[in-house]
Amino acid sequence: MSEKIRVLLYYKYVSIENAQEYAAKHLEFCKSIGLKGRILIADEGINGTVSGDYETTQKYMDWVHSDERFADLWFKIDEENQQAFRKMFVRYKKEIVHLGLEDNNFDSDINPLETTGKYLNPKQFKEALLDEDTVVLDTRNDYEYDLGHFRGAIRPDIRNFRELPQWVRDNKDKFMEKRVVVYCTGGVRCEKFSGWMVREGFKDVGQLHGGIATYGKDPEVQGELWDGAMYVFDDRISVPINHVNPTVISKDYFDGTPCERYVNCANPFCNKQIFASEENETKYVRGCSPECRAHERNRYVQENGLSRQEWAERLEAIGESLPEFVGA
């Protein structure tokens, strides 16, 4: 029986001097112990998801906690059967969360250590979900929401998080005077975004402390009132949250049946994320449109070594054809 893999999700807003040098040092240590994952280090803090066996992840947590700046850093731990990452990346960036403010001036950015929304534990957040007078706002990207979200949460008409501040400004009159509660995967985006809402003049702003990941592990709420699965930015793609009455809300792109399996369109110039069963991925060569299915650089065709004849037969089976110049 193979050893369990632990996946660590964490962040901390804290001032890091010489952050670029620290990022290089951090990467060196991670590689020395065989850790895999993706970490962002900025002047304002650290944000990461890493994976490894018990011994490796314990070494990493002990090393991080030995630094007084991160002595109280909160690691959220998942147990999995396989690695969530294939390589180790540690990158320096100006910010660990970019709000996309129109002036793009880092000096005007929000410091969550000074301004942030009120923390709500899972029980308090569940109560907020059931309160008709509370607005619950999902702060994640559109494709994250489509896989799973809290029941009754507002889905902003945006494609990604950077568009959220402008959307809120455009819709301010709808909930300016109401209690607003925000949530995200692990909490890092909400720390900054809820602070921005406070600065914008919203009177009562709360945030799910520890994010969806913590809500799903809470022994009392057990993820109840969450529909679907939670999107994660690693090889797992999704993880279960609701352990009371789980549901599947996302639908297969091709036939509309319940499906939580995300894939990227095989056309590298499209790369659209779609839900697709393995059967439909095979049937439609992972292309989201006739053009993508017949694209000369279709990655599904390349990855599976399909001959031109096999490719053409797949398309003919669904009433499409392969142009003569493609794959010739």
Swiss-Prot record:
PROSITE patterns according to UniProt: RHODANESE_3
UniProt cross-references to InterPro entries, sorted A to Z: Rhodanese-like_dom (IPR001763), Rhodanese-like_dom_sf (IPR036873), Rhodanese_C (IPR022111), TrhO (IPR020936), TRHO_N (IPR040503)
Enzyme Commission numbers on file: 1.14.-.-
Domain of life: Bacteria
Catalytic activity: uridine(34) in tRNA + AH2 + O2 = 5-hydroxyuridine(34) in tRNA + A + H2O
Rhodanese domain segment(s): 130-224
CDD domains cross-referenced by the UniProt entry: RHOD_YceA (cd01518)
SUPFAM superfamilies: Rhodanese/Cell cycle control phosphatase
Pfam families on file: Rhodanese (PF00581), Rhodanese_C (PF12368), UPF0176_N (PF17773)
Ligase is among the record's keywords: no
GO biological process entries: tRNA modification
Broadest EC class assigned to this enzyme: oxidoreductase
Active site: 184
Alphabetized SMART domains for the sequence: RHOD (SM00450)
Gene Ontology molecular functions: oxidoreductase activity, acting on paired donors, with incorporation or reduction of molecular oxygen
Keyword Lyase carried by entry: no
Known function: Catalyzes oxygen-dependent 5-hydroxyuridine (ho5U) modification at position 34 in tRNAs.
Family: Belongs to the TrhO family.
Stated name of the protein: tRNA uridine(34) hydroxylase
Species name: Streptococcus pyogenes serotype M6 (strain ATCC BAA-946 / MGAS10394)
